[in-house]
Structures are given as structure tokens and as C-alpha cells.
Amino acid sequence: MKNNYKIPWHIRQYVKRELMDYKDNKKLVEKYKSNIAAYKGDTRALLLVLARLKYIETVLDSLNKEDREAAEIIFIDQYTQSGAEIAKGLSKKAFYNAMNKVIYLVAREMDLL
């Protein structure tokens, strides 16, 4: 059975970028939390980052073990398809299926679909 994870290109690109920035955004939140007084004017930015992180974490937590591992290889470790195949043994089909599934589910979680 073929999964239909088709979404508009601009939404796909936006969500993919958010997923690729996940690790950096987590670090940013930790930086804010450790020195909140220094970032008084950026409360809105912090809230937006926290919301996006929550959407992504909700989706990651809902995935089965294989999809979760693939998502971490793709978006957290940021392997290319060929790199993931060589270093992690993730097939091309599994790579793209997991990537498309996670992007679709995050877009849906963000109410972009």
C-alpha cells in the first residue's frame, strides 16, 4: 500500500526547515532558560520556538520505533540519503517514506493542512 503524504511544496519546505532546525532550536531554548533576564524583549520569539518544538515532539513521540529512529537520522543527525544508507543501514525507500511521513504529520500538527 502506497502512503499519500503529498502536501504543497511551500508547506513542505517550511516544515522541513523547522525539522532541520529542531536541534538548534532546542539549544536556543536552553540558552533562554538559563539566562531569561537577558532576553526580555524576545518573549514572543521564545513562545513561537516553544510551540514549534512542541508540534515536532508530539509527532516524534507518536511514531513507531523504526520511524522515530529514521526521523532522528534524517532531521536530528541530518544524514543525507546516501549517508544514512551507508552509516546507518537505512534503505532509500525507508529514508524517503519516513521523511515524507514526518513532514506530513508535523504539517498537520501545525494546522498547515
Model regions and ranges:
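N-terminal interaction/assembly modules
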Residues: 1-62, 110-113
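Helix-turn-helix DNA-binding module
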Residues: 77-94
